[in-house]
A protein has these predicted regions:
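Short amphipathic alpha-helical segments, especially helix-boundary/capping motifs
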Residues: 2-6, 41-46, 57-61, 93-99, ...
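Long hydrophobic alpha-helices with heptad-repeat/coiled-coil character
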Residues: 43-57, 136-158, 276-284
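Active/binding-pocket-proximal capping segment
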Residues: 86-91, 230-231, 284
Length: 284
């Protein structure tokens, strides 16, 4: 099952009032489609996958793939599903999705990225209703949640890590898992932190797993995921909200101290709609 419309149809359907906006839409389309790999000759073949940038960031990348699939699903859901299926087939025995599959076939699997594939699958499915795609992906998504819960969780909340502890490059790899490679957030040791964005992404993950389980008539699973999402949202508001200063931020998972470093990540609880009215007004 595929939802496909041509470039011209998509641009006409989404036509804006200004030339600048229309130019940006066309640039979006041509950039994504210009970075699609051919079906053959790669480790992920026969799936058609998208790279962040041919010649600059070769290979296929974890959450880049999720974002690419969300984007192209607006005009070609088969291509969106190819990207997701092509990348997630490299899931390891613990359930972790790697960070990168390079063009030459090598895999960077010590670390991952925040869990976004459930949300990507939900969005793609809402556009074409392909239940077989959901059936194929659901076990992979469940295994990935298990990886985060078993290997990246302390006292009910998630943290970033890498599988190469003891190596000189370990702390840098943990930063890579966050996607905020050189952020001042990590001037304090990243492995000591409960990151605000990661835990909000995990709430999104639970919500999408709830939706997918319901679509597959897995009622007990759906109930479990929904409960996990509510529990985590409550912990975010309990542990990552600084009531004295009126903001959300990362917190030290060993001491409970909330960081004084404010970044756009602090707005994630508002984005996923778990902040109360008082918190939202304070952050405005």
């Amino acid at each position: 099952m595929n939802m496909f419309i041509s470039k011209e149809e998509w641009l006409d359907k989404n036509k804006r009032k200004s030339d600048m906006e229309n130019s940006l839409l066309e640039r979006t389309y041509t950039t994504l489609m210009g970075n699609v790999y051919d079906k053959d000759g790669y480790r992920w073949s026969p799936y058609r996958c998208i790279t962040p940038g041919k010649g600059s960031f070769t290979g296929i990348w974890n959450w880049d793939t999720a974002f690419h699939s969300i984007g192209v699903s607006r005009w070609d859901t088969d291509l969106a599903k190819d990207g997701i299926l092509g990348f997630t087939q490299f899931q390891d025995e613990k359930g972790k999705f790697p960070d990168i599959i390079w063009e030459n076939g090598n895999i960077e699997g010590h670390y991952a990225k925040p869990p976004l594939f459930s949300k990507a699958c939900e969005i793609v499915y809402r556009r074409d209703g392909d239940r077989e795609f959901l059936k194929k992906m659901y076990p992979r998504l469940v295994a990935n949640e298990n990886h985060w819960r078993e290997n990246r969780c302390r006292s009910g909340m998630f943290f970033y890590d890498s599988e190469d502890k003891g190596e000189e490059i370990y702390q840098l790899h943990v930063r890579y898992e966050s996607g905020w490679d050189n952020s001042v957030r990590w001037d304090k040791t990243i492995t000591d932190m409960w990151p605000i964005d990661l835990n909000c992404f995990a709430v999104m993950d639970y919500r999408s797993l709830t939706y997918i389980a319901n679509e597959l008539n897995l009622c007990d699973d759906a109930k479990m995921w929904a409960e996990k999402g509510v529990e985590l949202a409550d912990l975010i508001n309990e542990r990552l909200w600084d009531g004295k200063n009126g903001y959300y931020a990362d917190a030290n998972k060993l001491t409970g101290e909330i960081s004084d470093v404010l970044t756009p990540a602090s707005f994630m609880p508002l984005y996923i709609n778990i902040a109360g009215k008082e918190q939202a007004l304070s952050m405005a």
